């Protein structure tokens, strides 16, 4: 490095150790970099500012003398060249270069940013053209011959240049682009920072938990201290009571013994007095006549000797061994536990939407001071049973303060209660709480679905023995076969049917849920509804006995019968005179279109009628129906458009094989069309104050097929 020619003298720096790995700090944003040596960085920045001005002192001449008189420090007597990062990097790698301390001090004194800037501005102002000429003599800075590091040696963990990879010591090492290494390092730093943040959060949570444990230890200590004190006070009171009882009994025995001994002592004293008196009497008689003495003394001594003297001690001084009964004390000692029996738990009311059709989640709480080892959760169904017959009870043992009870019956109310247990014993039972399982899923009546371009009427069965609170209908718009997700929900439906507004020309998948206090049921089996046209089923309750309906539900058949003259009993809903059947059209005021396909030689009547049309009359024979009637006789077709037994005089030249019927509530019209040739046949103008339904009648054996749920043809839109 010392042999490089043409290099201007530069400020030498301390030599870095051999194992020092240099990382270019310019790769990082300056604002993200902390100043490691603030004072030195300030000095280097000032050097950089001064280094931008390279000059030759000879060009200035005596200006330095004048500027020195003005108090401005003189420039150093040598040229300054701006330092590139490559120089700084190379200076760190050089070894053996000597830096003089005096040069460093002179350079630091000279490179004051503010003074240098003022000097340069004053120089340009005072010298004018000369300063501009001076700028022309500034020697352009030579590009650093060394390339910046663009690779990163993974083995040495240091930035390198591409040439070092090909020919240097890093030839066999693993290298990667410097930008990629930088991104990897940043990602690793971010990961480590994230881990560190998680550790900090965990340590904070752990510290909070430790604080809670400290508080709990203090509370438990106070509670146990109070418990011990209470038990020991009870034991001491019991012992003191027993002590008093034993001392009192012992004192009574002492008194009894002393009284017996005292009585015996008094008796002994009396006997001694008697003996003394007898001795004195005998001594006196000894001095008297001897004959009398002998008589009296013998008699007196005989009486005295015949008297028995009790010389046995009436009461022994020893006391009997007193056996102390400490059974009750032992019982107290045995009952002195470190914990008390828990208090009665508090069972929580049922949370909304916490149950399924076969399970409920029961929760309860306990006082914080209680210690519990397990819980016994008991339950039984609440039903109307016979008097004297109780429902079976079930018990579950759990460790937690909640339990999910399974294998229950849907839409059924259960009674729950819980008992807490520990070593001291069980707690009292909690209050009883009522929980409800969710209902069973409803069953959609797919054969009874009615729809039009704007709405659909959905009917279903509850599927539950007990009543439910409400129903929810969920709609999913099917745009593609793989589409999923609920588009709309209709909630709070109190009955088992709902009229739902829909978008025309769409297909929907419909499900129904039942709801009660326990939560919603599972979804019902889905049904598909299309709003491409009016779709309605046939009302089997109105079907004449001579008619049958095919399996698809849209073909009406009249077969040959022998007893056709048999009179039928009048019915409220069933046709008995006219061999007819009605359809169930959705009760929506709008435009409804359907078609009937039949043999052109078949006698039939088709049209609309009110629901309460007389069932003992022919269709079109009253003011409750509007119909088109066809009869075929003698190779002639006769068409009548009947209402209240009247018909217009209309001739149809092309017998229709498929008739289209358009019911227009908005314009109060009923139109008939020959579908095959798109021919308009006739239009009724009728005031429909009530909803009407399609009606079909077969005057002779044959069949007709109903096509509904189809789009309205173009020719029908003009009427």
Curated annotation (Swiss-Prot):
Domain Fibronectin type-III: 342-437, 438-531
GO cellular component, one term: perinuclear region of cytoplasm
Tissue: Expressed in skeletal and cardiac muscles.
Domain of life: Eukaryota
PROSITE patterns recorded: B302_SPRY, FN3
Family annotation (Pfam families): fn3, SPRY
PANTHER family in alphabetical order: E3 UBIQUITIN-PROTEIN LIGASE TRIM36-RELATED, FIBRONECTIN TYPE III AND SPRY DOMAIN-CONTAINING PROTEIN 2
Protein name: Fibronectin type III and SPRY domain-containing protein 2
Origin organism lineage: Eukaryota, Metazoa, Chordata, Craniata, Vertebrata
Gene: FSD2
């Amino acid at each position: 490095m010392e042999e490089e020619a043409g290099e201007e003298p530069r400020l030498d720096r301390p030599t870095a150790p051999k194992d020092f790995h240099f990382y270019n700090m310019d790769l990082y944003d300056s604002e993200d970099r902390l100043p490691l040596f603030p004072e030195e960085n300030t000095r280097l920045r000032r050097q950089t500012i001064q280094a931008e001005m390279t000059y030759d002192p000879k060009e200035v001449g005596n200006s330095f003398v004048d500027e020195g008189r003005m108090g401005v420090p003189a420039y150093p007597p040598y040229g300054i060249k701006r330092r590139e990062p490559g120089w700084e990097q190379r200076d760190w790698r050089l070894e053996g270069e000597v830096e003089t301390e005096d040069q460093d001090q002179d350079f630091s004194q000279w490179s004051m940013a503010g003074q240098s800037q003022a000097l340069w501005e004053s120089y340009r102002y005072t010298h004018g053209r000369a300063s501009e000429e001076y700028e022309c003599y500034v020697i352009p800075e030579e590009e650093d011959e060394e390339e910046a590091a663009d690779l990163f040696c993974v083995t040495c963990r240091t930035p390198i240049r591409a040439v070092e990879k090909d020919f240097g010591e890093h030839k066999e090492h693993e290298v990667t682009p410097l930008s990629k290494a930088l991104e990897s390092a940043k990602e690793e730093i971010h990961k480590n920072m994230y881990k560190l943040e998680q550790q900090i959060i965990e340590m904070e949570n752990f510290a909070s938990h430790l604080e809670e444990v400290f508080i709990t230890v203090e509370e438990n200590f106070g509670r146990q201290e109070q418990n011990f004190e209470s038990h020991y006070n009870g034991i001491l009171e019991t012992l003191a009571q027993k002590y008093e009882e034993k001392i009192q009994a012992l004192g009574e025995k002492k008194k009894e013994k002393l009284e017996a001994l005292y009585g015996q002592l008094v008796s002994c004293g009396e006997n001694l007095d008697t003996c003394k008196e007898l001795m004195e009497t005998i001594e006196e008689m000894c001095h008297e006549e001897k004959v009398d003495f002998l008589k009296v003394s013998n008699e007196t001594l005989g009486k005295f000797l015949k008297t028995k003297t009790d010389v046995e001690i009436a009461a022994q001084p020893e006391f009997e061994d007193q056996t102390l009964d400490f059974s009750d004390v032992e019982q107290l000692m045995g009952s002195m536990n470190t914990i008390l029996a828990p208090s009665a738990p508090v069972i929580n009311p049922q949370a909304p939407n916490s149950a399924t059709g076969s399970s409920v989640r029961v929760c309860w709480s306990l006082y914080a001071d209680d210690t519990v080892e397990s819980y016994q959760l008991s339950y039984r169904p609440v039903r109307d049973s016979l008097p004297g017959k109780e429902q079976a009870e079930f018990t579950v043992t759990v460790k937690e303060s909640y339990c999910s009870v399974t294998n229950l019956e849907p839409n059924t109310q259960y009674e729950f209660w819980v008992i807490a247990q520990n070593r001291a014993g069980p707690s009292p039972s909690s209050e009883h709480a009522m929980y409800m399982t969710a209902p069973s899923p409803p069953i959609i009546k797919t054969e009874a679905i009615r729809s039009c371009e704007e709405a659909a009427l959905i009917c279903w069965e509850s599927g539950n023995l007990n009543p439910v609170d409400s129903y929810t209908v969920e709609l999913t718009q099917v745009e593609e076969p793989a589409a999923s997700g609920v588009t709309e929900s209709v909630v709070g439906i109190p009955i088992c049917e709902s009229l739902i507004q829909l978008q025309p020309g769409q297909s929907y998948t419909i499900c129904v849920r039942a709801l009660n206090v326990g939560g919603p049921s599972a979804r019902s089996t889905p049904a598909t509804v299309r709003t491409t046209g009016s779709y309605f089923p046939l009302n089997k309750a109105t079907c004449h006995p001579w008619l049958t309906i095919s399996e698809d539900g849209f073909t009406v058949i009249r077969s040959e019968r022998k007893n056709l003259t048999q009179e039928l009993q009048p019915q409220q809903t069933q046709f008995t005179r006219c061999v007819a059947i009605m359809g169930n059209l959705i009760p929506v005021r709008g435009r409804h279109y359907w078609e009937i396909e039949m043999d052109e030689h078949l006698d039939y009547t088709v049209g609309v009628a009110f629901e309460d049309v007389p069932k003992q009359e022919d269709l079109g024979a009253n003011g409750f129906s509007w119909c088109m009637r066809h009869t075929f006789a003698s190779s002639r077709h006769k068409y009548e458009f009947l209402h209240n037994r009247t018909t217009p005089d209309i001739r149809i030249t092309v017998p229709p094989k498929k008739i289209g019927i358009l019911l227009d509530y908005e314009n109060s019209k009923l139109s008939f069309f020959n579908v095959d040739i798109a021919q308009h046949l006739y239009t009724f103008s009728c005031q429909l104050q009530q909803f009407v339904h399609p009606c079909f009648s077969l005057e002779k054996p044959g069949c007709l097929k109903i096509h509904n749920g189809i789009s309205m043809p173009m020719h029908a839109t003009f009427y």
